Amino acid sequence: MMEKTVRRGTRTGFTTGACSAAAARAAVLGLVEGAVPEAVDCLLPNGDVVRFAVNDGACEAGQAAHAMVIKDAGDDPDCTDKAHLTADVRVLPGRAGEVVLCGGFGVGTVTMAGLGLEVGGPAINPVPRRNIEENVRAVGGPLLANAGIEVTISVPQGVEMARKTLNARLGILGGISILGTTGIVKPYSTSAYRASVVQGVQVAATLGHGVVVLTTGGRTEQFAMKERPELPAACFVQMGDFLRYALDEAVAQGLREVVIGGMVGKLTKIAQGETITHANRAEVDTQLLAELAARVGAPPDVCAEIAAAETARFGAERMQALGLGEPFHHALAQAVVQTLTAPDRYGDRFHLTVLVCDFDGSKITEAASGPAATA
């Protein structure tokens, strides 16, 4: 097994990129030494050297070799845990010093611009790409003096695993991405999802519509798609809790329109100034909801109930029962617009529309800012 911290609940793991680099290094050692080792010491992008167990080692007359490393994600609930990161390497006669990296079965193919990867090429991100080559060169020197080495990374379970990722939305088809900026997976880290949100905004920016639609989840995305049917699916990004990263990237990409689709809970947090809306970051400001309720005509006793409640949903349902659901949610949407377009936030860098739906995904209301400033 791979070496890592063993304290329950905090056991780190290794990225698909690190496992691919280890498999490639082991396979190249097979070319050089005539036998694939049962374990290999691999240099990670963060500078650590980690020993990985190697499986299915095989060599073919010094011209080709095969090795596989089983990904251990540690205590992180990663959909690529136990993936078989497989490297097939072969000698390229007459191409001294070249290392050619290819994607095999189960590694996605990039079909859209905006990801920093070649369209038509394998979804192997820049850091793992460099790390794989670095490990290949570290042990392949004797071969590379006179020939090149081709490395093909494949993942037998990659097509199925990719269905649990956002790859298809990002235009990465046919498998998973080979990822990892450090080589290490931290338990319950949000870095991978956060990166996918940023990538989603980047892809949306390449489509020429000048707009990205940010939603908090699947239900709000389906709702938003009904509201903006003229837009392709790649303009919609499930940002989860990561509004700040999505909006910062929208500004960086020069997008002139941003649409946010959400329900009362997340929208309340945004209205109160939170741009990372995870439940652990801040409590819902029910006093704010009570003030909005009062503004649209709720009686004082109801406002007091809303202020004392534990959830935003209580306030929404209480106002709906009074027949004040639409004006209440409209006031909330306006509060979101005012918060995000304040001069010390995003100002007029983009036109903002906030779409509000109920818990069944049906539209309640919307609010919008003034026109965006001319670029």
Curated annotation (Swiss-Prot):
HAMAP family (UniProt xref): CbiD
GO molecular function: cobalt-precorrin-5B C1-methyltransferase activity
BP term (GO), one: anaerobic cobalamin biosynthetic process
Family: Belongs to the CbiD family.
EC class (word): transferase
Superkingdom assignment: Bacteria
Enzyme Commission (EC) number: 2.1.1.195
Gene designation: cbiD
UniProt keyword Secreted, yes or no: no
Keywords, sorted A to Z: Cobalamin biosynthesis, Methyltransferase, S-adenosyl-L-methionine, Transferase
Entry annotated with the keyword Transit peptide: no
Pathway: Cofactor biosynthesis; adenosylcobalamin biosynthesis; cob(II)yrinate a,c-diamide from sirohydrochlorin (anaerobic route): step 6/10
Organism: Paracidovorax citrulli (strain AAC00-1) (Acidovorax citrulli)
Protein name: Cobalt-precorrin-5B C(1)-methyltransferase
Chemical reaction(s) catalysed: Co-precorrin-5B + S-adenosyl-L-methionine = Co-precorrin-6A + S-adenosyl-L-homocysteine
